[in-house]
Amino acid sequence: MSVFVIAEAGVNHNGRLSTAFRLCDAAKAAGADAVKFQHFNSAALWNDDRIAHLELRDAEIAVIAKHCASIGIEFCCTPFGVREVGVIAPLVKRIKVASGCLEKWELLASVQATHLPVILSTGMATEGRIDRALKALGYYATLEQSLTLLQCTSAYPCRVEDANLLAMDTLAQAFGAEVGFSDHTKGITVAIAAAARGATVIEKHLTLDCTAEGPDHKASIEPQEFRVMVRAIRTVEEALGDGVKRAQPAEAETRRAWYGD
């Protein structure tokens, strides 16, 4: 099993392109498979321009994607509107849908129209709401082999006791999709545990400075800790094995000592 690790840069660039580049570089150095940003229009989305300084313009999104390609890390992005879906679709290999967009039907229809693989966070949602979102995405007809559902608790930060990793099993059984975990807890223990429980995608917020001003920095980890997390996840991958119960080659000498064969 290979875990796809996403470094969620989100809005931790604080509206500065140079910081966005540094986040991409840090994600690559830490061993992440992808780095993810957000594309939104705050006035259109929330009728509130207080976080307008955290927006990235279309041209900036394209420049960040180009930078990611130049350093060898996948560029991911979450669109928060139909227009933004059209902007990012030519730049990404997959689209990440945020928990807050689970009931935005026009957006989901536009995501379906891209025919790209989908990663869907499920924070704040019940099975029934997820089912309706999957119908809007055309999952049952067209996307069955290219959907990953992320267990997510939309609290920043999330308490460990609210992470509910067992819900990954529920999602897998209910919808037959790949499952993963979008982690908002402090530290890296819960993300590593999710990998051990079979998550195929781990998403974790990355910041250059946890003490910086901004909505997500306190629910993020810095590059050195992110690197430790990725290494631990890769160790978990090795330890999981293939599930076949058999005598391992490393046991041969011990078996000979006990049984003589």
Residue ranges and their predicted role:
Residues M1-D261:
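Catalytic cores and adjacent flexible loops of soluble metabolic enzymes
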